[in-house]
Curated annotation (Swiss-Prot):
Pfam families: Cyclotide. The presence of a 'disulfide through disulfide knot' structurally defines this protein as a knottin. It comes from Viola pubescens. The lineage of its organism: Eukaryota, Viridiplantae, Streptophyta, Embryophyta, Tracheophyta. This is Cyclotide vpub-C. Keywords: Disulfide bond, Plant defense.
Length: 31
């Protein structure tokens, strides 16, 4: 949850979750 994935998750889930990103504070982060 440190590196921003350049995607927001306000309205839709993180598409970048397929590469290990997760939603945190309306922004997708990679752990």
């Amino acid at each position: 949850g440190i590196i921003p994935c350049g995607e927001s998750c306000v309205f839709i889930p993180c598409i970048t979750s397929i590469v290990g990103c997760s939603c945190k504070s309306k922004v997708c982060y990679k752990n």
